[in-house]
Amino acid sequence: DGSVSTAGSKLVLSPELWSAETPNLYTMVLSLYDSKTGTYMGSVSQQLGFREIEFTKSEVDTNGNRITTDSEYKPITINGKQLLLKGTNRHDTDPEYGKYVPHETQEEDIKLMKQYNLNALRTSHYSNDEYLYYLCDKYGIYVMGETNLESHALMNQGEKQVNFKNLAMDRTVTAFNRLKNRTAIVMWSTGNENYYSSSASYANGMFYDLIWYFKNNDSTRPIHSESSDGNNGTDMRSNMYPSVDTLYSRAAANMPYVLCEYDHAMGNAVGNLKEYWDAIRSSDNMLGGFIW
């Protein structure tokens, strides 16, 4: 088919590590030469950062039920320090330009986030413009990389959801291959409000397969799925809009926990923010959250 693949490696000694606080980046340049004549054919470059995310990988039985016990989980860390997400959800849209958001506006968004001590972004609920990920790498923003999958209307109708299995897998594969080399992506997400079943066979294994596509292809990032308790292989618990009391119970349970949406910031909202964060800071297994 005219394609060729190759593999190589290079050891980088004592690199300056990347994090939201210190977004150190390096530039990798790959150049192609004709193997017979040595003629230069062209180059591509990619910015990348060095960082290590450590987490406990959830194991499941053949039915998708989690067999990793709560006590076996360790806090999720980046470069040996607790990963704490002070984040927001963001739709890739603009009141003036609609779905075409200028690069300048995207950069203004990221700069405002940094100025207000936000360090994380959930790309609700789809992959965003490539430039946004470049900015997150550059400025230091942790990103939950979401598959373009939102199934509100069919949330508990597996017999109908299965009709979209090929589409969902295609979007998952596309998101992964497009974003896998982005330093800012610190976790993967299978989308938004998709399903609430712990069974691996639900929707003919659709969501189980999406989760395990990520797990089988990337052992360096944890997997998120809203409302999952680790079943089907997700590596953290997640809920939308829980009570403060629920947060304390999750903190006591030891498994990593993230608020993928909370404190709906519309109208007279964003209540109990201090109480939420008192609960989040009460235990190292708490990952923080993303305001809606």
Question: Model-found features: residue ranges?
Answer:
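Substrate-binding/catalytic cleft of secreted carbohydrate-active enzymes
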Residues: 110-112, 120-292
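Secreted/periplasmic carbohydrate-active enzymes, especially glycoside hydrolases
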Residues: 1-124, 135, 140, 171, ...
